[in-house]
Structure formats: structure tokens, C-alpha cells
Amino acid sequence: MTGGTIRERVVESAIAITVQDGWSSVTMARIAEAVGVSRQTVYNEIGSKPDLAQAVVLDELARVLAVVQSAFEAHPRDLRAGVRTAVRGVLEYGADDALVHAIVAGTHGADTDLLPLLTTSSEPLLEVAVEVVAARLAAYRPGSRDVRRVADLVVRVVLSHLMNPAASPARTASDLAWAVDRLLPT
């Protein structure tokens, strides 16, 4: 594996192993071999396996938030369309992404070590996502001071639908966009 910093290569390797064999197959020795460095170098770059898990999830979050940013940029004057496009994009991304499937599989009895980073220990992830969504919502200058609350609601609902979809991405996106439009009149 070549290209990128050692840290980036370590995270990419952990993702590849997780997708192929599950999180329980990820070891620092296996990553070191894939990256072409010593196991100690992996520990120096990342820390412990829980630190690596957080790095993997935050890397995936960055990809998801790029979808969110792009969706809002495509609709700079239409809050409802921006929310609808962002939510649909994230849900479709999650439905197609092998790492998201590997993480969410923990809800169905498979490897569960990554799942707490989306559920019971999700505060770091949620904080980052809520900040990005709140900033995007605030750009529409809604007539409400509850932008952060609404952003938190949106992030938590989308996360819930990533783990256990109740409807199609299009339907969920439309419903959530309708709700945001009511909660944040522009």
C-alpha cells in the first residue's frame, strides 16, 4: 500500500480489512504488514485498537459529510431541497458503502466493536456531524434560533435510518426535508 501519510495508509488498511474480513480480523500486525511498516509504527501513529476504530469511523464520517456539503452547495437558496438532497445522498451512500455495511452489521449480531461509535459512544461523531449540518442550515438564515436543535434532530434521524431503514432513501429524505422546512421557516 503506497500513497498518503502513514496514518492515512493505516486507516485505509483497517477499512479494507474490515470490509473484507470484519473488524475482529483487524490487528496492528496485519495492518503493519499491509502498510509496510513495523507494528510499533502503527501504534505510534494511531495508538490502541479503540483509537484506530475511532479513526476509521471519523474517516468514514468525513466522506459522508462531503456528500452533505455537496448537496447543500447544489441548493444554496432552497433549504428544503438542500436537506432532501443531503439526506437522500447520505442514505444512498450508506446503502452502497461496504464499510457502513460492516459497521451496521453489528446491529444484526456480527462484529460489534465499531457499533458503539455510532450508538452509545457516538458523541464525538455526533458533535462533528451536528456542527456541519447546523452551519449548513444556518446559511439559509432561518427565522428560528433552534438551528442547532434541528441539526441534532436531523443527524440522529439519519443515523437511525442508516442503521435500520424504515423507508426508501427518497421517502425518508422527503419526510425529513418537510419537517425541517416546518421547524426552520426561511
What are these regions (language model features)?
Residues 88-92, 119, 130, 185:
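Intrinsic, short, N-terminal disordered tails of RNA polymerase sigma-factor systems
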Residues 3, 147-155, 172-176:
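Short amphipathic alpha-helix in the helical subdomain of ABC transporter nucleotide-binding domains
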Residues 27, 99-105, 112, 116, ...:
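Short, hydrophobic secondary-structure boundary micro-motifs
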Residues 35-46:
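Short hydrophobic/aromatic patch on the recognition helix
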Residues 1-34, 50-54, 59-62:
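Basic, helix-initiating cap at the start of DNA-binding domains
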Residues 51, 55, 68-96, 151:
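Hydrophobic alpha-helical connector segments
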Residues 65-66, 102, 111-152:
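Amphipathic alpha-helical packing segments from all-alpha helical-bundle domains
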Residues 92-96, 135-139, 152-171, 182-186:
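Amphipathic C-terminal alpha-helical segment
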